[in-house]
UniProtKB/Swiss-Prot annotation:
It comes from Mus musculus. CDD domains: VATPase_H. Belongs to the V-ATPase H subunit family. This is V-type proton ATPase subunit H. Signal peptide: none annotated. Subunit of the V1 complex of vacuolar(H+)-ATPase (V-ATPase), a multisubunit enzyme composed of a peripheral complex (V1) that hydrolyzes ATP and a membrane integral complex (V0) that translocates protons. V-ATPase is responsible for acidifying and maintaining the pH of intracellular compartments and in some cell types, is targeted to the plasma membrane, where it is responsible for acidifying the extracellular environment. Subunit H is essential for V-ATPase activity, but not for the assembly of the complex.
Amino acid sequence: MTKMDIRGAVDAAVPTNIIAAKAAEVRANKVNWQSYLQGQMISAEDCEFIQRFEMKRSSEDKQEMLQTEGSQCAKTFINLMTHISKEQTVQYILTMVDDMLQENHQRVSIFFDYAKRSKSTAWPYFLPMLNRQDPFTVHMAARIIAKLAAWGKELMEGSDLNYYFNWIKTQLSSQKLRGSGVAVETGTISSSDSSQYVQCVAGCLQLMLRVNEYRFAWVEADGVNCIMGVLSNKCGFQLQYQMIFSIWLLAFSPQMCEHLRRYNIIPVLSDILQESVKEKVTRIILAAFRNFLEKSTERETRQEYALAMIQCKVLKQLENLEQQKYDDEDISEDIKFLLEKLGESVQDLSSFDEYSSELKSGRLEWSPVHKSEKFWRENAVRLNEKNYELLKILTKLLEVSDDPQVLAVAAHDVGEYVRHYPRGKRVIEQLGGKQLVMNHMHHEDQQVRYNALLAVQKLMVHNWEYLGKQLQSEQPQTAAARS
């Protein structure tokens, strides 16, 4: 990976402001371990160890102690977490564990080694903490789990990993709901604090996705839709950056690049790039674009991503970005790389590639191919390729889009397809397209009504020449002016 990966990985492990501030407050409130010992809530062994551990101020002193007493350390921390219920003390224990791991990543091994002795895994010690009520406790536990999973030699697997990823998805989705204006139960947490806790969750995901095996598990858990949902809503630039960082990490795997084709990621990222005022957001989008073009091993996949970028006007954005000065040389290198690759793709661009890319982006407009008799004559049959992939997208747009221009162009294209492909009517009917077009004959927008009517008539009529003469008198002025 590039050096940016290392920077990002460090960013992901650093706590957000609210957690850092609360952790400082927690550290300052020392625990009276003797009172727990007198109350018989902890053992003399654990009490003695934790007091000695607290006295080790320097990292070197702690390391020396952990090398000889690592097992006791893990045992004591787990015993304390298990037997003490007071929230303030649990916060203190988790903060000590998190500090210890942050100081030296290799220390995660003490928990794995201890668990192995009892023929268990480290996860059951920390996963139940995610169900607690206190947000600081929950998010500290989440950070520790991510560090154990990302830095340990043993992978989190099966139901433990599913549970953790589902928890992350739920937290990120709560942010998505907040962005859409839906009321979300956040207890006494302010929206500012809440967004910082969500950034902490995103940081956990960033750490996890540095491990290739977790990338596949995240995708299988429908995690990409979760990321896209957050990005599609209004979220702060920091969370935006973290979500795109996660996409960038996923795109290091050639198999992932192949899989990510289905999520329409390029239009969303190009919109964010267009509006971005933060250099770090610009940088991570360009790096993600580069991964899509560089890590994909299949030529067809690379070409599809390149065409999507061209369709979304990324070339123009790159030319504008090229004029600016950057402190980060990665940005300049990525701009140069992308300009070169997209420039090559433009040279190879056929009218069908252009049409296919526009259709897959879901952003239909009256580009020249739609009105080109030659295009439809030569390419109508190609809409049947890959089990009618493009026709299915076309009919889906008629079903779900609320953009009048998209609906008008889609209805027009259905009509042109059936006009130029002899068995087109039957195919469109089987895909439910005929009914969808008919539904738009009474649309409030005149262009949608007109193109739906035209398409329905093409679905019904056999004499195209006669139909053409009939329609000239019906064509609305706006359409006449455009053509």
